[in-house]
Amino acid sequence: MSLQEKFDAAVEIIQKLPKTGPVATSNDQKLTFYSLFKQASIGDVNTDRPGIFSIIERKKWDSWKELEGVSQDEAKERYIKALNDMFDKIAEELDVAAWLEQIDPVIKTNLALIGK
């Protein structure tokens, strides 16, 4: 399986995670996944920094800007690693196998694709 296919599977997992519940992503995790996704998909920041009153957009832009110079492939690898690390941490507190039976089956399939 190619890096792009693994990355696409990881992105789909994040997109399909329930918004609430035991495996909801924190704001910091969302910011990490956002910035890595942008770097992996587009590369270095290609827009102006949002204004001071656009707090959320500015945080997202700053997080992406911090990845400047990271290759798109490296960003994809980091995205997949961040997802794997997140599930490792979740597994310390939750029976992930049982949880996976209750949610979108695509998540379970895609976790297997990325080596989880």
Curated annotation (Swiss-Prot):
Binds medium- and long-chain acyl-CoA esters with very high affinity and may function as an intracellular carrier of acyl-CoA esters. The gene is acbp-3. One of its GO terms (cellular component) is cytoplasm. The lineage of its organism: Eukaryota, Metazoa, Ecdysozoa, Nematoda, Chromadorea. One of its GO terms (molecular function) is fatty-acyl-CoA binding. The keyword Transport applies. This is Acyl-CoA-binding protein homolog 3. Belongs to the ACBP family. It comes from Caenorhabditis elegans. InterPro entries: Acyl-CoA-binding_prot_CS, Acyl-CoA-binding_protein, Acyl-CoA-binding_sf, FERM/acyl-CoA-bd_prot_sf. Keywords: Lipid-binding, Transport. An acyl-CoA binds at Y34, S35, L36, F37, K38, K60, Y79. The keyword Disulfide bond does not apply. PROSITE patterns: ACB_1 (PS00880), ACB_2 (PS51228). Residues 3-92 form the ACB domain. GO terms for biological process: fatty acid metabolic process; lipid storage.
